[in-house]
Curated annotation (Swiss-Prot):
GO MF term list: acylphosphatase activity
Protein encoded by which gene: acyP
EC class of the enzyme, as a word: hydrolase
UniProt protein name: Acylphosphatase
Family assignment from sequence similarity: Belongs to the acylphosphatase family.
Catalytically driven reaction(s): an acyl phosphate + H2O = a carboxylate + phosphate + H(+)
């Protein structure tokens, strides 16, 4: 079943290769969507794919790349048209 989740990741998540690492992990898991920095220092990600793969990526967001220090990940289900790829915005 295809699911779509919007995530907000807080902590030390900018300037630590978080977006590039998220894209790499998403591609590995077959998840589509996008990831971007927010002006308030958080990172926002939209994840779409098979429920199991999206859940695996959500769990990975709590760790992130080596230099990241994630303190919170908020997520909510959203409904959007199907996405074809994963991109860094």
């Amino acid at each position: 079943m295809v699911t779509c989740v919007r995530c907000l990741i807080a902590g030390r998540v900018q300037g630590v290769w978080f977006r590039a690492s998220t894209k790499e992990k998403a591609m590995e898991l077959g998840v589509r969507g996008w990831v971007r920095n927010l002006p308030d220092g958080r990172v926002e990600a939209l994840l779409q794919g098979e429920a199991e793969a999206v859940e695996a990526l959500k769990k990975w967001l709590w760790r992130g790349p080596t230099l990241a220090q994630v303190v919170d990940v908020q997520s909510e289900m959203v409904e959007i048209p199907e996405i074809q790829m994963f991109e860094v915005r």
